[in-house]
Amino acid sequence: MESIRWLLTVAQFDFDMKLVQSXAIVNYVANK
């Protein structure tokens, strides 16, 4: 059970990173 929670945490972190990156890209393009 503990490993599932760990996997979900990693997946959430990965999702957050992708969200931050895409947002940064959108921001960069919008400010050009």
Curated annotation (Swiss-Prot):
One of its GO terms (cellular component) is cytoplasm. It is found in: Cytoplasm. Keywords: Cytoplasm, Transferase. The N-terminus is blocked. GO terms for molecular function: glutathione transferase activity. Glutathione binds at residues 21-22. Signal peptide: none annotated. It is an enzyme of class 2 (transferase). It catalyses: RX + glutathione = an S-substituted glutathione + a halide anion + H(+). Its EC number is 2.5.1.18. Conjugation of reduced glutathione to a wide number of exogenous and endogenous hydrophobic electrophiles. Belongs to the GST superfamily. Alpha family. Homodimer. This is Glutathione S-transferase 8.2.
